[in-house]
Amino acid sequence: MDWAEVQQRQEAGTLHEQAGRCMDCGVPFCHQGCPLGNLIPEWNDLVWRDRWDEASERMHATNNFPEFTGRVCPAPCESSCVLGINQEPVTIKQVEYAIGEKAFDDDLIKPYVPQRLVGKTIAVVGSGPAGLAAAQQLTQGGFTVAVYERDDRIGGLLRYGIPDFKLEKSVLERRLEIMRQEGTKFRPGVEIGTDITWDALRRRYDAVIVATGATRPRELAIPGRELAGIHYAMDFLVRANHLVAEDHVPDPIDARGKHVIVLGGGDTGSDCIGTALRQGAASVTSLAIGRKPPVDRADEEPWPMMPRVFEVSTSHEEGGERMYLASTVEFVGQDGRVTGLRVAETEYREDGSRGPVAGTEKVLPADLILLALGFTGNESRELTEQLPVALDSRDNVARDETYMTAVDGVFSCGDAGRGQSLVVWAIAEGRACAAHVERHLTGQTRLPEPVTPSERAIDLSL
């Protein structure tokens, strides 16, 4: 099976042309589309002038991990590009990807070791993009930082949630090695709440950052849910990533020779499609309850908002069928195993609700059904049992405008506090949280604060 990355670097001439299309707008809306506030016109201009070392410096000024976002970010900056009003936007993501790769190729990425230590210790719990960003910012600022991860390897979502064909793990490892050289300590295989209690961790460190993600999957409570062969998407992807890493997996979920149905049309669902196809699935069908998105931007989602449009990922290009307006009715099974999914057409009612249309039911054959329906908050009961940390109405870790929770010195960032979101938002929150931790411990900060905890994507509804 070929798990190699499918994304390729644009030809030098094409990159030069795309970077040159950037108009260096007086008000660059691409900044507003990016929660990191990336200096996009600046590094576009530098690429156009073949000054790649300076382009890398300007890119890393706002983004700890451009090699990650250049691969997995949906590029809301491109939706906000002024050129996109009447033509195709600049391919910002491709330029970002190329800068990141050339920087590593040319050995421009060097560890930044602080000249002096502050004398304060910080524990970061969770090693996804938010936790890693916070850890690197604080380590470079002179703090002694330890990152705890319950899995056997560091990386969180980047390690086991995203397939290699989108993000090869060698890309993650080379960045982690830079962080090790800077002084960040990694503690994989340690589950806070079990191996070390949360209250003991708080006593041990001057500050604690909760960056555990939003890992509780959304359920689908319809008849037949107890049948074997129905799995959460992340359970499938995590096992697949372990297999690609040549780990022993005692209970693999294998799509080989099976008719696979993926419920959910987002990035996680797309990753399931590509993974199932590589495993040799007999067929893959993706179902979404909503309408098929339009090809072009809808009037109610004007520029510079990121519109909901019909997208074709590399996984979709590889095969499978996509169905819309499909309401799930019942999991069908025999002898305790799933054999199909009963679906019906979806209707939108005048009151805004939606549901199945009577008389339109049919059964789709399925040996494996994957639930890629999103996530509903933090799954760690130990956190709230061992510390007086509050959860908000969506079961995310509640925090104030300084990212601090109800417990003094305990902060929360990324999906753990924001809820399910994008890698780019997680990095932005990790950077901002680090600034507030520094201010809390020293009374001042030199670190950037790209986003507030309550900030969201561009909203023109007000």
Where are these regions (language model features)?
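FAD-site-proximal beta/loop scaffold in flavoenzymes
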Residues: E226-G257, R349-Q420
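Feature captures the FAD/FMN-dependent oxidoreductase FAD-binding
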Residues: E54, R116, T121-V125, E173-I222, ...
